[in-house]
């Protein structure tokens, strides 16, 4: 991606249609118009009034950092130094002044949300340095049309319509252009007065790249065409402190003040505002160092009814970090593939963009040169996605969680491989290593950017797998072989096997499958040997899982994973001509076992077993696990109830999770669908609470509390709740809510599934929580991307690149929906018995269509 390199993409300006006069629909709910949720916000509609207060919409690139556009138009959560920095609201703002109207200067933002006045950092000191004390517009409204966030400002005292559009590139299948460290704010103005008016637009910033305790390294505000660069030098001992942030515009009339008035107290800020109030335009050259802030000005004139758009572009460059995570190998068995990290330029993580651009000027040049093309293709995605006629709560849920891919939760290392946290802490990554048992749930990346998702499989079955087939469920950073000194995650490792099948079907790359299959087989054989040594077809031995504990004895959750992995091995092995007899045998035994031994007539349970196993007793095993060992009281409890942290006779929302994973990977459900459906209906009946006021949650109540509703992770409708069930059992996780909702819909229970979705999104209406930050163990938590499965659940639309076959199985009658494949994206529609495909970008070669299980010729 050199400066003058052209963007490479396959774009089809034409549409192709496959029209089939068949009944492609089932009786079901027709799509409804957006309606207010329980809390009053219209699903997928604008946020205003009380529902605006928490809105913060991420803008940035995949693994490149971000800033958020708040519902008011303010900038916050600036996180561009390769780590999260929540609540970092830098002292930056746009402003407008009208020369013909006294006292007309306004910050181009809406009213400051009330919570900031006392709930923000440094509130007890009066919030020094904040811009909140400046005049601003009286009303604001926010509309999300991912990846675009739109703010409308109004003020009856100012005859000016103002519209702000914030965005950054997001183009499915084009991972590189979607991973740029850039963003843009487009300010549009319309003169609604009856007179010609003269205006001065300005964008103003303190040097927020300056590190507060840095005395050895200089800070600067440098020049760039049409703007300025906020800059902090690094040192030989700490190169990671170097960082640049460019703010500029292509407007021909721009004038730049590179150095605000220098002085003590609030002199620089006060003098900058004095200039804005007077409508003064000042050109000031850069100084050597310690410039407190800078402004760019664009004066313009509008006749009545005329409009003006100013495009403010941002680019940043922080090429170094001090991030190195993971224990080094302790055995020759730990390193079974070449250590590619030795080829990287640093022992520490370096972001992908630093391999493509030499400095911030190169980033800005590329951004400027390709701005219109990148915007056009991002808008093409937006238009295709929002062309959907699916229920608005579904569109809202999916789009809101695509922002995770722009958050500091995700990273790309120097060689382009994808790596991620589980979520983002306030100032740290939360739970490292592309955690397999969390990222199992996330379905968006595999469809939108398949090459990045496939890099995860290459890592899991490469650097993260040892000679025995044991996988570490947390990958090192930089990615390299790592010590295998903890339990494998049963759900993560078995889920990864199913996802190899998924990546094969999405990519159509059978050569890749053939190359990785021996390592996948070694992983599967490890799972059998470790958790099903007696070949019963069930996961019996203690097994670590996504609840950060070990389950003892067979259960529906992990046994469904086991069966799904066995079925995927059978399918892949047969295609490759491999011996799969053992996998078929275990699958049949396990299917019968799960249906006959683990189903109680309403739902699948766990049979707690801790004696007669190969594993050490729970007291010994706990010494290696999270949560520490057994106290004397815990040993007494063990003798009475069995191991801590089990669910036993409980109704687990994840109780058939492996079956859902199989379904979204394109595999058949591993057990009887009638029993699966009954389990899900029991989860809906017992675990979905519309009001949690009387619910006891001694764990982490902030996810759902009080009058709010939510889907509990587990309940015990038939009794039998242990004194210490698994550690998160009383919580509510959005990723599990969407998993259950989409699985219900897959099984034809659309009403119940949408009820779960609405209950979840009602908590994220903007008045209490940020609608674009579903959190669990950290902000922008990856599990919430299970919401993407709602697309396939409602429509049955799935593209198989191996067979070049499109599958359709609508649960909502006629529809138009979004489809993304490895080679392009577009829309699939079902109207009056006809199925059509419109390719918007790239290509989607369809040779066959399966509609409700019936093969139809093109």
Residue ranges, per PLM feature:
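Bacterial N-terminal signal peptides that target proteins for export
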Residues: 2-13
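Aromatic-rich carbohydrate-recognition surfaces in CAZymes
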Residues: 97-108, 116-127, 191, 229-232, ...
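Acidic-aromatic substrate-binding/catalytic surfaces of carbohydrate-active enzymes
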Residues: 62-130, 233-278, 350-364
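Extended glycan-interaction surfaces of carbohydrate-active proteins
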Residues: 391-425, 451-484, 530-554, 595-733, ...
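C-terminal substrate/ligand-recognition segments
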Residues: 184, 298-303, 310, 431-438, ...
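Non-catalytic C-terminal accessory modules of carbohydrate-active enzymes
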Residues: 63, 74-76, 82-164, 171-175, ...
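Acidic/polar, glycine-enriched structural segments that form the non-catalytic walls/loops
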Residues: 24-40, 46-51, 55, 155-159, ...
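Bacterial N-terminal signal peptides
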Residues: 12-21
């Amino acid at each position: 991606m050199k400066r003058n390199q052209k963007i490479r993409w396959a774009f089809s300006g034409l549409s192709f249609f496959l029209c089939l006069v068949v009944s492609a629909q089932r009786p079901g709910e027709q799509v409804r118009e957006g309606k207010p949720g329980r809390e009053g916000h219209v699903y997928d509609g604008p946020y205003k009034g009380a529902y605006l207060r928490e809105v913060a919409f991420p803008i940035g690139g995949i693994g490149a950092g971000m800033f958020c556009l708040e519902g008011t138009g303010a900038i916050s959560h600036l996180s561009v130094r390769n780590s999260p920095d929540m609540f970092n609201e830098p002292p930056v703002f746009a402003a407008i002044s009208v020369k013909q109207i006294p006292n007309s200067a306004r910050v181009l933002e809406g009213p400051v949300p009330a919570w900031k006045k006392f709930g923000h950092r440094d509130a007890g000191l009066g919030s020094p340095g904040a811009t909140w004390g400046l005049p601003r517009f009286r009303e604001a409204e926010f509309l999300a049309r991912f990846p675009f966030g739109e703010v409308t400002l109004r003020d009856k005292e100012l005859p000016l319509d103002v519209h702000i559009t914030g965005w950054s590139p997001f183009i499915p299948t084009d991972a590189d252009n979607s991973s740029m460290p850039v963003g843009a704010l487009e300010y549009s103005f319309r003169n609604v007065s009856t007179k010609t008016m003269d205006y001065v637009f300005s964008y103003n910033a303190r040097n927020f790249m300056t590190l507060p305790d840095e005395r050895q390294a200089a800070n600067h505000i440098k020049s760039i065409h049409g703007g300025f660069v906020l800059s902090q030098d690094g040192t030989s001992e700490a190169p990671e402190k170097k960082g640049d942030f460019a703010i500029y515009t292509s407007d021909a009339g721009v004038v730049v003040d590179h150095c605000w008035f220098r002085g003590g107290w609030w002199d620089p800020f006060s003098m900058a505002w004095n200039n804005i109030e007077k409508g003064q335009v000042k050109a000031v050259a850069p100084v050597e160092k310690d410039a407190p802030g800078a402004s760019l000005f664009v004066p313009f004139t509008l006749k009545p009814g005329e409009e003006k758009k100013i495009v403010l572009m941002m680019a940043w460059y922080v090429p170094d970090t001090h991030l190195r995570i993971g224990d080094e190998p302790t055995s020759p068995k730990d390193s079974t593939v070449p250590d590619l990290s030795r080829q990287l330029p640093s022992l520490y993580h370096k972001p992908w963009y630093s391999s493509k651009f030499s400095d911030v000027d190169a980033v800005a040049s590329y951004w400027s040169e390709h701005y219109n093309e990148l915007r056009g293709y991002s808008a093409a995605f937006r238009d295709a996605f929002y062309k959907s006629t699916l229920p608005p709560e579904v569109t809202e849920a999916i789009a809101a969680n695509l922002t995770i891919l722009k958050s500091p939760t995700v990273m790309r290392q120097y060689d382009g491989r994808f790596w991620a946290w589980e979520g983002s802490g306030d100032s740290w990554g939360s739970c490292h290593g592309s955690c397999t048992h969390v990222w199992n749930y996330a379905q968006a990346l595999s469809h939108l950017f398949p090459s990045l998702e496939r890099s995860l499989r290459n890592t899991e079955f490469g650097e993260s797998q040892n000679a025995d087939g044991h996988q570490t469920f947390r990958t090192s950073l930089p990615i390299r072989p790592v010590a295998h000194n903890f339990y494998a995650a049963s759900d993560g490792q078995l889920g990864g096997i199913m996802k190899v099948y998924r990546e094969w079907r999405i990519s159509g790359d059978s050569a890749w499958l053939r190359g990785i299959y021996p390592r996948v087989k070694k992983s599967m054989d490890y799972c059998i040997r470790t958790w099903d040594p007696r070949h019963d077809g069930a996961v019996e031995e203690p097994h670590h899982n996504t609840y950060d504990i070990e389950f003892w004895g067979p259960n529906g959750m992990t046994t469904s994973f086991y069966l799904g992995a066995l079925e995927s091995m059978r399918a892949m092995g047969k295609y490759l001509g491999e011996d799969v007899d053992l996998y078929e045998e275990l699958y049949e035994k396990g299917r019968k076992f799960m249906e006959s031994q683990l189903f109680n007539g309403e739902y699948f349970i766990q049979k707690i077993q801790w004696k007669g196993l190969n594993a050490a007793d729970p007291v010994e095993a706990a010494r290696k696990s999270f949560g520490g060992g057994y106290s004397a009281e815990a040993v007494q409890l063990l003798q009475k109830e069995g191991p801590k942290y089990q669910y036993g006779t409980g109704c687990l929302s994840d109780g058939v999770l492996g079956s859902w994973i199989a379904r979204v990977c394109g595999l058949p459900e591993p057990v009887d669908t009638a029993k699966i459906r009954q389990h899900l209906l029991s989860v809906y009946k017992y675990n979905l609470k519309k009001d949690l006021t009387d619910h006891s949650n001694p764990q982490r109540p902030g996810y759902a509390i009080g009058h709010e509703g939510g889907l509990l992770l587990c309940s015990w409708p038939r009794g039998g709740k242990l004194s210490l069930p698994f550690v998160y059992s009383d919580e509510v996780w959005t990723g599990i809510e969407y998993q259950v909702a989409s699985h219900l819909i897959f099984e034809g229970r659309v009403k119940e599934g949408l009820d779960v979705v609405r209950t979840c999104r009602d908590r994220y209406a903007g008045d209490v929580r940020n609608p674009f930050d579903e959190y669990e163990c950290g902000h922008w938590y990856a599990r919430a991307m299970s919401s993407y499965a709602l697309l396939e659940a409602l429509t049955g639309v799935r593209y198989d690149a191996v067979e070049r076959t499109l599958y359709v199985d609508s649960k909502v009658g006629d529809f138009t929906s979004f489809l993304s494949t490895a080679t392009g994206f577009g829309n699939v529609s079902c109207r009056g018995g006809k199925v059509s495909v419109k390719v918007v970008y790239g290509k989607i070669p369809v040779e066959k269509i399966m509609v409700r299980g019936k093969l139809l010729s093109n």
